Amino acid sequence: MIHKLTSEERKTRLEGLPHWTAVPGRDAIQRSLRFADFNEAFGFMTRVAIKAQEMNHHPEWFNVYNRVDVTLSTHDADGLTERDIELAQFIDRVCAHTLPAA
C-alpha cells in the first residue's frame, strides 16, 4: 500500500515546492502554468505524460491554449504521497522557463 504523507511530512516536503498550493477541501496540491503559446503548453504536457507513464502516476490537468492547470494527489492513498512530490519536482524542472500564471 502507498504511504500517505503525514501532516509533518507534508509540511516539510512542500517547503521545497513554493509554486504549489493546497487544494481546498482535498489532500492535493495544484499549480497553474502559462506558456508562450499552445505548442509550448502541449510540449510540456507531453514531457510530463511520458514521465507520468514511467511512474504509473498520472496528474489531473486542464489545458486551454497556453495555460495548464495541474493537480496532484494519489487516489490509491486518498491523499498526498511521495509520488506526488516527485512528479511536482519533475514538473518544476520542466517548466522552469515558463511565464508566471495569470
From Swiss-Prot:
PANTHER family: PTERIN-4-ALPHA-CARBINOLAMINE DEHYDRATASE. Its EC number is 4.2.1.96. It holds the Pfam family Pterin_4a. This is Putative pterin-4-alpha-carbinolamine dehydratase. The lineage of its organism: Bacteria, Pseudomonadati, Pseudomonadota, Betaproteobacteria, Burkholderiales. InterPro entries: PCD_sf (IPR036428), Pterin_deHydtase (IPR001533). CDD domains: PCD_DCoH_subfamily_b. Keywords: Lyase. Belongs to the pterin-4-alpha-carbinolamine dehydratase family. It catalyses: (4aS,6R)-4a-hydroxy-L-erythro-5,6,7,8-tetrahydrobiopterin = (6R)-L-erythro-6,7-dihydrobiopterin + H2O. One of its GO terms (biological process) is tetrahydrobiopterin biosynthetic process. Signal peptide: none annotated. One of its GO terms (molecular function) is 4-alpha-hydroxytetrahydrobiopterin dehydratase activity.
